[in-house]
Amino acid sequence: MAAVTKKIKRDPAKNPMRDLHIRKLCLNICVGESGDRLTRAAKVLEQLTGQQPVFSKARYTVRSFGIRRNEKIAVHCTVRGAKAEEILERGLKVREYELRRENFSSTGNFGFGIQEHIDLGIKYDPSIGIYGLDFYVVLGRPGYNVNHRKRKSGTVGFQHRLTKEDAMKWFQQKYDGIILNTKK
């Protein structure tokens, strides 16, 4: 009796290595000056994420804005995992799940901003005030760690890399999002 081997045709869309996930969510509040306003912005990020935010320094002096080199002017925080998905969901709800095509980068990431942090469900505190913040979402696939690990690092193949269209399709499927085409 001869062994019969069958060739199984696999659908590339069902390959688990092609699934997209959120690698990290970066939240940023740029105040443009150091001092009390910056520490209050840090409190906002700490309330939102439950993590200790990091201060960003100015790269160079801009006299017209009154910014000196190495002066702390912004605060940011990186969130991963389920907490990142939950915060992103709240941010997209503020934007009514609408993003422009220009919000997506060629490497498959996307970002957007909101005007007021209190729209995210944080109670308004008069001593803190109202701050706007930027969301930046970095997407990835299984196997992307090859590029970032210290030992035996490699590169992600061209077919496995994310494109702008992949990110837009993922956003539309996962969040039932609307992508607006803006014309100049």
From Swiss-Prot:
GO cellular component entries = cytoplasm; cytosolic large ribosomal subunit; cytosolic ribosome; nucleolus
A single Gene Ontology MF term assigned here is: structural constituent of ribosome
Q: Name one Pfam family in it.
A: Ribosomal_L5
For whether the record's keyword set contains Repressor, the answer is no
Q: Which GO terms describe its biological process?
A: cytoplasmic translation; translation
* Keywords associated with the record: Cytoplasm, Nucleus, Ribonucleoprotein, Ribosomal protein, RNA-binding, rRNA-binding
Localisation per UniProt entry: Nucleus; Cytoplasm
Entry annotated with the keyword Membrane: no
Q: How does it assemble?
A: Component of the large ribosomal subunit. Interacts with Fmr1 to form the RNA-induced silencing complex (RISC), a ribonucleoprotein (RNP) complex involved in translation regulation, other components of the complex are RpL5, Rm62, AGO2 and Dcr-1.
Q: Kindly give the NCBIfam families that the UniProt entry links to this protein.
A: PRK04219.1 (NF003258)
Q: What does this protein do?
A: Component of the ribosome, a large ribonucleoprotein complex responsible for the synthesis of proteins in the cell. The small ribosomal subunit (SSU) binds messenger RNAs (mRNAs) and translates the encoded message by selecting cognate aminoacyl-transfer RNA (tRNA) molecules. The large subunit (LSU) contains the ribosomal catalytic site termed the peptidyl transferase center (PTC), which catalyzes the formation of peptide bonds, thereby polymerizing the amino acids delivered by tRNAs into a polypeptide chain.
Family the UniProt entry places it in: Belongs to the universal ribosomal protein uL5 family.
Write down what this protein is called.
Answer: Large ribosomal subunit protein uL5
Which species is the source of this protein? Drosophila melanogaster (Fruit fly)
Name of the encoding gene: RpL11
